[in-house]
């Protein structure tokens, strides 16, 4: 009888242990699932439902249309705040004109259509739509940072439609004239002033390009330094200056902290991964490895109201 009690007690104990292990496993699995879902929704923006507007100030049979052309991004929250912010500012400034959206990246267009059921025209589709709608005058404002390959491709595409409209006018990229540089410097330094404590390097990450237009980064660096912001540094993710230059700058200035901000219209893949990601080769990781405190700011230039107004001024010059 005593042996039977021992066996029953042992079985009961084993049962309790098994139940405990199962519960722990379920809890761990649940946590992993939540973490995985959070990672998946970071890009799609499902945590905060967003609404894309692709046509503003909609009119019947508009003679003149403003088309805002962007590369695009699949990061929904950033797209609404940045590209949407620029488009909205233009629409508000010119309420008598219909404003339409077009993207140049077919990969992003296809991804948004498949993942989110969001339909956005590419440039050719937007031009064909304008022709079909009987639009006579087209004002095209790109949100590009510089006059590089993307801008050249857009210009060539518009030339194919020169006989389809009474007029096609193409606006300038963000950084074109000296006054543009001055306005951008004022906008970004005002936006970052709360981080400027004398012990912090403020680094802006641009995309970079093999085109001659890559020189805009050196020019912006020269002008921002000349304006007295000697703790500001410009780098690029795919060209020169590079993260190595940013690290050297931060070391030379004996800075303790580095604030990272995209020098891009949107805070998309480059900002979230190449700049602020946890991978070993991200700017954040490389700077932390060198002993710096790193503060990533995941905000695209397009959500800065002062930057939005520069694009508004470029459109105004065409109307």
Over which residues does each language-model region extend?
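Bacterial N-terminal signal peptides that target proteins for export
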Residues: 1-11
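Extended amphipathic secondary-structure runs
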Residues: 10-13, 81
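Alpha-helical transmembrane segments
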Residues: 14-18
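C-terminal motif of bacterial Sec signal peptides marking the signal peptidase cleavage site
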Residues: 19-23
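Active-site-proximal alpha-helix that buttresses catalytic centers in soluble enzyme cores
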Residues: 25-319
């Amino acid at each position: 009888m005593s042996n039977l009690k021992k066996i029953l007690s042992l079985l009961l104990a084993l049962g309790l242990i098994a139940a405990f292990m199962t519960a722990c496993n379920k809890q761990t699995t649940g946590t992993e699932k939540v973490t995985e879902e959070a990672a998946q929704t970071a890009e799609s923006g499902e945590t905060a439902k967003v609404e894309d507007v692709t046509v503003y100030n909609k009119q019947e049979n508009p003679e003149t249309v403003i088309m805002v052309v962007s590369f695009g991004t699949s990061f929904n929250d950033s797209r609404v705040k940045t590209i949407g912010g620029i488009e909205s500012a233009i629409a508000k400034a010119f309420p008598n004109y219909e404003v339409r959206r077009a993207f140049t990246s077919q990969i992003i267009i296809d991804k948004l259509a498949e993942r989110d059921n969001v339909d956005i025209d590419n440039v050719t589709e937007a031009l064909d739509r304008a022709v079909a709608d009987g639009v006579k005058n087209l004002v095209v404002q790109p949100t590009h940072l510089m006059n590089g390959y993307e801008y050249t491709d857009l210009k060539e595409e518009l030339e194919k439609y020169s006989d389809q409209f009474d007029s096609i006018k193409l606006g300038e990229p963000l950084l074109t004239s000296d006054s543009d540089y001055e306005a951008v410097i004022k906008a970004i330094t005002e936006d970052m002033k709360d981080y400027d404590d004398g012990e912090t390097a403020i680094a802006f990450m641009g995309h970079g390009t093999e085109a001659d237009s890559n020189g805009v980064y050196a020019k912006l660096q020269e002008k921002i330094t000349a304006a007295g912001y000697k703790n500001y540094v410009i780098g690029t993710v795919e060209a020169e200056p590079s993260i190595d230059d940013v690290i050297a700058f931060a070391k030379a200035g004996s800075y303790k902290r580095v604030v990272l901000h995209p020098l891009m219209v949107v805070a998309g893949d480059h900002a979230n991964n190449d700049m602020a990601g946890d991978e070993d080769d991200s700017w954040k990781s490389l700077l932390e490895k060198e002993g710096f405190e790193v503060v990533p700011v995941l905000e695209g230039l397009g959500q800065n109201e002062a930057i939005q107004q520069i694009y508004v001024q470029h459109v105004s010059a065409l109307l």
